[in-house]
Structure formats: C-alpha cells, structure tokens
Amino acid sequence: MLRTTFRKGFNLKCFSKDWNQTRQYSNYTKMTIFDTNVKTIQKNNTVTNVDDPKHYDYLMNEVADRLADRILDIKDIKCGNVLDFGSRNGALFKYIQEKGAKIDKYYMVESSKELLYRDDNNVSQENEDDNNNNKVKPTKILVNSLEDKIEGIEDQSLDLIISNLSLHWVNDLPGVFGGLKRLLKPNGVFLASLFGEDTLMELKDSLYLAEIEREGGFSPHVSPFTKISDIGNILSKNRYTLPTVDTEKITINYDNMFVLMRDLQNMGENNAILKRRNYTSKDTFLAASAIYKHLYGNEDNNSIPATFQIIYLIGWAPHESQQKPLQRGSAKKHFSEISGTSSFGYKFDNDSSIPSILTNENNSVTLSQQQQQQGIEPQQSNDDSINEPFPKTDDFVIKRLDYHGNFHFEKQQQQQQQQDQNKESSDEINKNKDDK
C-alpha cells in the first residue's frame, strides 16, 4: 500500500561462541568498514542531544510497519520466541503487536543503551494496560556491538528473528547471518530490512561533484551500502533455505540538503566510516547544496528528493518439511513431450522422446548430414526466409541458418561477390593496357 506522509521539511512518497565460528565457506575475510563505537555514540546522541527524538522516527516507523506486514503475511508463521536484532527503541515490536501476532517471548538486542531504554519513562501507563491485556513485555539485551555474542539465548531456541534497518552498519554480515541461524529452531524464519546501495544516491553525487570542484579531491561522506546480490549470496552460503530478497524505494522530499543532513544525524544514520574525513569546508557544503537542487530539485515546490532503497530478505532454517528440488535425472518424461515438438519445429516419435536429429552420443548433427550417412539424397530446403533481403556490411559477413540448421550464403551476396571479382579483373586489364 502506498502511503504519503506530510510534515514540515519533508514529504514521504510511496511508502563463548564467536560469530566468526559460524563461517560456512572458504576464502572469507572479514572487512572492517564502520567504526562501531562511533555508531553507538551517534545513536546515543539521538536521545541525549535531541529535544524530541520521536519526531525523527518517521522513516524507521514506516519501514517497520511494512516489515510487520511481510512477517504476518507468511502462512502459518510462528511468533512464539522472537528476537529483534538491532531493535533501536522497539518500533517493530509495537507494530507486530498491533497487527495481532501471538508472542510468547520477545527479545530486543541493541548496542545503544540510550536508544534501547528511550521510551521506558513514557510508557508506564501503557505497560499497565499491556498487563491487563496479557501482552508480552520485551526482554532487553544490551551488547557492545551487534557483532558480539548474544548472552542469554540458547541455540535453536527462536521461532523468528527480525531486524529493521540495522544490519547495514554491521562489518561482518556473513558471520552475523551465520550466528543468527544457529539461534533459529528448525523451520525458523529470519526476516529483515536494510538500506541498499542506491540509498542517498543524490546526496552522494552532489557531495562528490562539489568536493572535486572546490577541493580537487574526494572522500566518502555517505557510508557504503550493501548490494542486493550480495545479500542473496550471504543467505545461500550460510545455508538458509528458500532465500528470498526483494527491494523497494522510498522517496522523501526535503526543503534543502541541510534539512536532510540534520534529519539523518538525529536518526543516528550519519556517516560512521572508519577512515572518514573529519572536516569539510562550509564552501563545499554550500556548493553541494546548489548542485543537489540543480540536478535533482523538484520544480513544483522547490524541494529536493532523497531516495532510500530498502532491501527485504527472508531465509529459513533447514527442516525436512520444506520444499526441496528433485534430484538431477529423476524426471520421468522428456521436457519436449510437454509440447510434442522440438525447438526446431519437429515432432517426436511416439515411441521415443529423443529427436531424430540427435545421435546416440548426443552429438548434434543436421538433418541433411544424417540423410547422407544413410545414403539418402538430401532434400532441398523450402525455407523462404533464405531469399529475404539481408543487411549489407563491410566489416563482417552474414550467414543464415535455415530451420534444418544448415548454413546458407545469400544469393544476393554471392552475386555481389561475383560482380566485385569481375570488376577487379576488368580494372586490372585496363591498367595493363595503360601501362603498355
């Protein structure tokens, strides 16, 4: 369902076991891209340094709502024991409960203490109502980093693991995916959302062009995001079954680039690259803002768009009840029997599913070659397409295959070649006469 949210400044459109022990494949090297300590500080600052932190939850809440819909759309989903990985303030928990999920235990894991306990002082009355309605109270687990071992949760004890817009700050995605899989029961589900590589592409382009023009060099100001193909590969290599990955884009309109950067900072989504530049001149930012508005600005309301690509992923812990592909060679019928014809238009014999133009050694031969081997005069092709006009080029020769698979040079081409040879002979004779 497409949603449109309006607020001042923007417009939303369409809306110990170590992790490393779980590596399932070779040639794997952990890369450290993000400074996790800085990211924790940035998340804490969204609570301590912002007057109204809830004012900047609009993007997290929107994606959490969509992710909750996807969770409950799964047929016969079991929400008994649930882990919210990178839960922030627990927005996903709220939406899942509102949509009627039956939860026995709910664990919230977060590296930011301020963000994890942000809403505790404001929900005392809600907790009393929840107790009266027999709703589950979440168990909150604070970790130093999302890549650390989660204490207090046993292996194969969870029915569902969910994560909303947190995994894009993890350095060791393969290790974390493998570690989460160890916590799932057989047939348990892992479902998450994270930012994709097209996120904030307008901001990246504008800062790049401005810094190149004003300072003669460039350093990354927007953290790199994961490709959708990489997510699928990580799921498969960690032995998740029935992996599925899809994506959508959310576009938010802001008054200018500085409003966008302010909101990103107050969300805790500002840059956290390990080797980032600590200072950029005011002149460069002003130039970037002008470039942003010139290249991507909306003419109707003088605003600028910001694109957020959301990647959704789902994977299952293996179980014998899940669908599995048939073993190779177990088919009882040839695929061609479904239509009764081959790809060349020939019908197959009733007693055999092997086409007559294939030998027993499965080496492809043409029909005329097979007839020659049997001493039969090859039949002349009646393919009218041979006489059709063909493009004439000087850099390559065009050959045509009839539906028997035989090569045919075009008659026009043969005639043209003969004319060229005659012309060359005539020119040579005239040249000899002139020499004499």
Swiss-Prot record:
Subcellular localization, as worded in the UniProt entry: Mitochondrion
Gene Ontology biological process terms, A to Z: culmination involved in sorocarp development; methylation; mitochondrial respiratory chain complex I assembly; negative regulation of autophagy; phototaxis; sporulation resulting in formation of a cellular spore
Transit peptide feature, positions: 1-25
Signal peptide (UniProt feature, chain positions): none
CDD domains cross-referenced by the UniProt entry: AdoMet_MTases
Top-level taxon: Eukaryota
Main location (coarse class): mitochondrion
Keywords recorded for this protein, A-Z: Methyltransferase, Mitochondrion, Oxidoreductase, Transferase, Transit peptide
Biased composition (Basic and acidic residues): 391-411, 421-436
Gene3D superfamilies (UniProt xref): Vaccinia Virus protein VP39
Region (Disordered): 365-436
Low complexity bias locations: 369-380
Knockout or disruption consequences: Defects in development due to mitochondrial NADH:ubiquinone oxidoreductase complex (complex I, MT-ND1) deficiency. Increased autophagy.
EC number(s) per entry: 1.-.-.-, 2.1.1.-
Gene Ontology MF annotations: methyltransferase activity; oxidoreductase activity
PANTHER family reported in the protein's UniProt record: ARGININE-HYDROXYLASE NDUFAF5, MITOCHONDRIAL
Protein name according to UniProt: Arginine-hydroxylase NDUFAF5, mitochondrial
Species lineage: Eukaryota, Amoebozoa, Evosea, Eumycetozoa, Dictyostelia
Gene: ndufaf5
